[in-house]
């Protein structure tokens, strides 16, 4: 029996058409699957004008489209894009996604990132999630960044085994910029068997939240040192 003809799929399809949808945040009924209008009012999607390099929103369009920080110290990433500003709205969705068996949120969150992914995507891309250490993976049972990457990427570009986290570093929460950089120093490595696949190819790194950019920077430096092409970052939300 094909999946499309399975009882579970057919029951789910019927329920999707006949039953009212519930908001993923407040649980109230909403017109479509996703977030109701009242909760969506708290969202801060990121859109142009923004810095071409780091993706920070700009107050108005600039001739060179670079923020002051990227003029002074450009990041190693070719570009970074985020779906939302990190606030109460995006925090609630991301925490549910990460810590409450929230894999059912993957399509909704993936759709929020789809336009940014399309803008960054180019032929020959590898789509690489920021990896979890195996201890954290066993505790959570899934890597939320890998699930987003799987949803966004063409099958032949999804590359979850290229980048490895070789040390179980402590959480970045509550650390300042310098502490975050130190905390992720030397954390990542490229799997030796993956180096030929990686060589010269552009990479889109997928993560959930960008605070200072320390994690994306450490991962990017690791990939570039292993011979990748340009590296781009895509996150659900970023702290401003």
Please provide the spans of the model-predicted regions.
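Glycine-rich phosphate/pyrophosphate-handling loop used in enzymes and phosphotransfer proteins
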Residues: 1-240
């Amino acid at each position: 029996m094909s999946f499309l003809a399975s009882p579970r799929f057919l029951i789910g399809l019927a329920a999707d058409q006949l039953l009212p949808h519930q908001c993923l945040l407040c649980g109230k009924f909403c017109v479509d699957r996703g977030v109701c209008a009242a909760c969506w009012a708290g969202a801060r999607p990121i859109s142009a004008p923004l810095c071409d390099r780091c993706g920070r929103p700009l107050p108005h369009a600039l001739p060179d489209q670079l923020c002051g920080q990227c003029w002074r110290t450009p990041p190693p990433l070719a570009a970074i894009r985020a779906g939302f500003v990190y606030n109460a709205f995006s925090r609630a969705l991301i925490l549910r996604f990460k810590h409450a068996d929230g894999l059912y949120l993957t399509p909704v969150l993936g759709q929020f990132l789809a336009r940014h992914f399309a803008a960054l995507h180019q032929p020959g891309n590898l789509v690489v999630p920021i990896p979890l250490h195996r201890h954290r993976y066993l505790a959570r049972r899934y890597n939320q960044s890998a699930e987003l990457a799987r949803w966004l990427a063409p099958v032949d570009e999804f590359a979850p085994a290229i980048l490895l986290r070789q040390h179980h570093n402590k959480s970045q929460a509550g650390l300042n910029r310098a502490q975050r950089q130190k905390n992720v120093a030397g954390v990542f490595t490229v799997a030796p068997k993956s180096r030929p696949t990686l060589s010269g190819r552009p990479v889109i790194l997928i993560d959930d939240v960008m605070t200072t950019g320390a994690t994306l920077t450490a991962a990017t430096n690791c990939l570039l040192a292993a011979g990748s092409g340009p590296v781009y970052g895509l996150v659900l939300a970023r702290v401003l």
